[in-house]
């Protein structure tokens, strides 16, 4: 998976800069695991677009729970 490639081959060589907990790569893995490929990619993309120095968001940004109907 591309996220694991980034985490183990690229991330160790660049300074930690993620503004959130969990990190963006951890968030992406959890979002994909919890919500599947489509919603997981949507949530990950939204998160990456918010992760920048001018962001006014809270430090904690957790993957939303999966809604169960019924």
UniProtKB/Swiss-Prot annotation:
InterPro entries: Membr_insert_effic_factor_YidD. Could be involved in insertion of integral membrane proteins into the membrane. Keywords: Cell inner membrane, Cell membrane, Membrane. Coiled coil: none annotated. PANTHER family: MEMBRANE PROTEIN INSERTION EFFICIENCY FACTOR-RELATED. It comes from Francisella tularensis subsp. tularensis (strain SCHU S4 / Schu 4). It is found in: Cell inner membrane. Pfam families: YidD (PF01809). It is a peripheral membrane protein. This is Putative membrane protein insertion efficiency factor. The keyword Membrane applies. GO terms for cellular component: plasma membrane. Belongs to the UPF0161 family.
């Amino acid at each position: 998976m591309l996220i694991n490639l980034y985490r183990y081959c690229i991330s160790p060589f660049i300074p930690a800069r993620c503004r959130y907990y969990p990190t963006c790569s951890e968030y992406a893995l959890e979002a994909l695991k919890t919500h599947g490929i489509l919603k997981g990619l949507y949530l990950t993309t939204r998160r990456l677009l918010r992760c920048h120095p001018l962001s006014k968001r809270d430090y904690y940004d957790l993957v939303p729970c999966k809604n169960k109907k019924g």
